[in-house]
From Swiss-Prot:
UniProt subcellular location: Membrane
Keyword annotations from UniProtKB, A to Z: Disulfide bond, Glycoprotein, Membrane, Repeat, Signal, Sushi, Transmembrane, Transmembrane helix
Sushi domain mapped to chain residues: 46-110, 111-168, 169-230, 232-295
Gene3D superfamilies on file: Complement Module, domain 1
Summary of the knockout phenotype: Morpholino knockdown of the protein causes defects in development, abnormal locomotion and increased mortality. At 3 days postfertilization morphants have abnormally (delayed) developed eyes.
Protein name: Sushi domain-containing protein 4
GO terms for biological process, alphabetical: chordate embryonic development; regulation of complement activation
Compositionally biased residues, Acidic residues: 470-484
SUPFAM superfamilies the record matches: Complement control module/SCR domain
Classification lineage: Eukaryota, Metazoa, Chordata, Craniata, Vertebrata
Annotated source species: Danio rerio (Zebrafish)
Secretion signal span: 1-35
Major localization class: membrane
Gene Ontology cellular-component terms listed: membrane
Disulfide bonds: 48-90, 76-108, 113-156, 138-168, 171-215, 201-228, 234-280, 265-293
Amino acid sequence: MFHHADKGGKKSAFGHPVCGQIILSIILLRPPLLVTAFPVNTVEEQICKDPGFPEHGIRTPSIGKFFENSVARFSCADGFSLKGPAKIICTRFYNGSLGWKPSLKPVCLSEDCLPPFIEDADVTNRTYRPGDSLIISCHEGFQIRYPDTETMESVCQADGTWDNQPTCQGCLRPLIPPHSYMNISETKFSVPVGTVVHYQCFPGYKLEGPELLECMYNLIWSDTPPRCLDVEACSLPPMIEHGDYTCHPHPCDRYIHGTVVEYYCYPGYSLANDYKYITCQYGQWFPQMQLYCVKDETTWPGFQDSLLTTWKVVACTATSVLLALLLVITAKMFHYKCKSQQSPSDEPDESRDPNILVVDGVAVPLPSYEEAISGNYCQPPNDLPPDGLESAQHSEEQNPPSYPGHTGSQNSVPLDTGDVENCDSLSDTSECLQGLQPSSSHPGGLNMSEKTNAITSMEETASTSPSIDIADEIPLVEDGEEDC
């Protein structure tokens, strides 16, 4: 129950004016209002965390709490330099929390460079000031290597670090193939020059490649590492029916890498394929093909057709050759037969001459076609002495021949020999023939009866047909009639 003051300004029972009590009563009785504001922070949220002290450094203030806008300053002891901000401020962020700005924590670094640790090397000096160069010596068999090959120097920096810090290297530790081991510890990153590595394989494996490797002066190995292969890398080779196989190298107790197997067949059988070898390569037989033996008399499909085709070709070739030979033989026989019919062997030599015509055993010389149509001609037989023959040829060149039925030439001149003379008329034919015949003392000459018969025959012919040219009655034997 509230007590109100009177008009005289009396106080209430609480010792306050009555109007104040009325205002307080109104505030307590009115409904609450909606107000937007920052959340109320706790005590821990109203201060920044302690930034701490840098090693070999000092902080100001060294104690106390850091409220908003508080400042902390840092410095380093002698011989050390500050790295980072020299002061930081406690700042409120957008989310209402407090924190240091800048947030990087400063540190104090030694102004001298500490000697670095380099494996397989000895560092000469223990204290290095900024700008000093590092002096080291590598162990025997190792060589110094710099990251920057152009500088070839390591310098102490102002922050106490080393620039272009070198290393001492040898040959890098070689790889260990599977199923093998070597005489180098696994903890060694590199080995000195001249080191020899000995590789060995576990039981059941065979070494393929060099057994020893040496580290060369140029920091590379003398050869590539070997590998260990399974001694029985390949399974049993496939068997074939009616055959067997043999190994190279012999005997076939293990089928290691590189083993060659040669197949063969039992007597009476042969391999169907020409290739009969397989090789063990990395645990597999190569080439992978099916081999089998077949009987020798077995013929493959198409073999009979090819055989018939071969016989056909051979038969056709033989028939063609025989026909050609038969034609050649027939032509030769026909040619010989024609020659034998034209000039039999028992005929005198005079009949074989195409310019001689034998009439009742008398050889009569025949003129050529040009001589027959040009004039009269009379020539002694071929068995006259050479002198008479030359005179007859001389007479033939000077005077054209005359035949019965034609007027004798006015320019005919008797030959010097007297053996051959021109026949100007039919009445002189007998005398001309008598002059042409050789004497009875000449071998092979004709007797008087034969001469008389020849003269009589020619006179009868001339008297019967005085106007007929002898060249028209006597057939000319041309060169074309020799061939059949």
